[in-house]
């Protein structure tokens, strides 16, 4: 397996997952609980779960996808765009999320941040560039959180 997780293949695998496995995965309330679900391992095994460097990223990605089958909708980057739609832009474009909730998300501690993010995803049902979001989730540190806030605020101000 290459050094990077194939985010689109993971997205498609999630979309094609049977309803029973989806339901098992959706029931978890935080990312580490996925480790107790056999269907989770069947889903992530082809994406390099054995590589310890991929495990946290895969936990975060699947936890976000587990908000629902059609909650996160992928849209390819258009030819006139330099980048696809980021998570921050998508949340702002939804018109359902306010700045205070984004601020709370970026200030939250580990685990709580993913729980809050999944709630935001469920509420906003964003249309975004999934590989771009997956890359953000791979690292999910201070810089990625700041980028989320920056994209959200700049998009909100542009739409106002």
Curated annotation (Swiss-Prot):
Instruction: Tell me what turns on expression of this protein.
Output: Repressed by H-NS, activated by LeuO. Activated by the BaeSR two-component regulatory system, possibly due to envelope stress. Part of the casABCDE-ygbT-ygbF operon.
An example of a GO molecular function for this protein is: RNA binding
- State the superkingdom: Bacteria
Query: What's in the GO CC field?
Result: protein-containing complex
Gene3D superfamilies recorded for this chain? CRISPR-associated protein Cse2
Among the GO biological process terms of this entry, one is:
defense response to virus
| The protein's role, per its UniProt record | CRISPR (clustered regularly interspaced short palindromic repeat), is an adaptive immune system that provides protection against mobile genetic elements (viruses, transposable elements and conjugative plasmids). CRISPR clusters contain sequences complementary to antecedent mobile elements and target invading nucleic acids. CRISPR clusters are transcribed and processed into CRISPR RNA (crRNA). A component of Cascade, which participates in CRISPR interference, the third stage of CRISPR immunity. Cascade binds both crRNA and in a sequence-specific manner negatively supercoiled dsDNA target. This leads to the formation of an R-loop in which the crRNA binds the target DNA, displacing the noncomplementary strand. Cas3 is recruited to Cascade, nicks target DNA and then unwinds and cleaves the target, leading to DNA degradation and invader neutralization.
Of which family is this protein a member? Belongs to the CRISPR-associated CasB/Cse2 family.
Q: What is this protein called?
A: CRISPR system Cascade subunit CasB
Task: Give the lineage.
Answer: Bacteria, Pseudomonadati, Pseudomonadota, Gammaproteobacteria, Enterobacterales
Write the gene name. Answer: casB
């Amino acid at each position: 397996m290459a050094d990077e997780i194939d985010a689109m293949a993971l997205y498609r695998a999630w979309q094609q997952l049977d309803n029973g496995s989806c339901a098992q995965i959706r029931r978890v309330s935080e990312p580490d609980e996925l480790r107790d679900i056999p269907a989770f391992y069947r889903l992530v095994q082809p994406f390099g779960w054995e590589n310890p460097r991929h495990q946290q990223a895969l936990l975060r990605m699947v936890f976000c996808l587990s908000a629902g089958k059609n909650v996160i909708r992928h849209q390819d980057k258009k030819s006139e765009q330099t980048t696809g739609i980021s998570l921050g832009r998508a949340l702002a474009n939804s018109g359902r999320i306010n700045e205070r909730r984004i601020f709370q998300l970026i200030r939250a501690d580990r685990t709580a941040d993913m729980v809050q993010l999944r709630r935001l995803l469920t509420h906003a049902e964003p249309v975004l560039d999934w590989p771009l979001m997956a890359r953000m989730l791979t690292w999910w540190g201070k810089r990625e959180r700041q980028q989320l806030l920056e994209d959200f605020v700049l998009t909100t101000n542009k739409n106002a």
